[in-house]
């Protein structure tokens, strides 16, 4: 979760990712967003349960506080280990860095939809929108998925 969040944040932020004050909070927020998708679906499937329950689809807020803490430590370590902006340049040349994140969004988003967990589904759709915005697929999504023609680049390569 953490590495994918970090990488997605780098791509979505573009040149703004050069600032650690922008990059790090964005990555931490994306980790939290992914857990807001994962945990409700996992609880619905019975993969895990919390004795005290929780107001967010059976998940206590303390779980998310723990994710914020662990994400903060992990993201800072990634930033140091990957030399922050040096990774951004490498990421721009590799089209397939986020393939497993696509699977994550589809799988856990679909499970949330099946259990009528609408808020986690909305977060999954937002993450999916972020993935679409990065345009990191080995096929033209706009040509493959009906209704997404608006994603096609304009003349000159710009997206709408």
Positions of PLM-derived features:
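Aromatic-rich, lipid-facing transmembrane alpha helices and their immediate juxtamembrane interface loops
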Residues: 1-160
């Amino acid at each position: 979760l953490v590495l994918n969040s970090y990488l997605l944040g780098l791509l979505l932020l573009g040149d703004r990712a050069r600032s650690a004050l922008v990059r790090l909070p964005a990555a931490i927020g994306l980790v939290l967003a992914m857990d807001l998708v994962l945990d409700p679906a996992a609880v619905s499937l019975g993969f895990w349960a919390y004795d005290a329950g929780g107001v967010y689809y059976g998940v206590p807020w303390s779980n998310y506080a723990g994710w914020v803490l662990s994400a903060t430590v992990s993201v800072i370590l990634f930033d140091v280990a990957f030399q922050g902006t040096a990774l951004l340049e490498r990421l721009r040349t590799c089209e397939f860095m986020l393939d497993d994140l696509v699977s994550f969004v589809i799988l856990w988003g679909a499970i949330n939809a099946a259990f009528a967990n609408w808020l986690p589904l909305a977060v999954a759709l937002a993450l999916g929108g972020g993935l679409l915005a990065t345009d990191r697929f080995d096929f033209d999504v706009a040509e493959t998925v009906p209704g997404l023609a608006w994603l096609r680049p304009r003349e000159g390569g710009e997206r709408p």
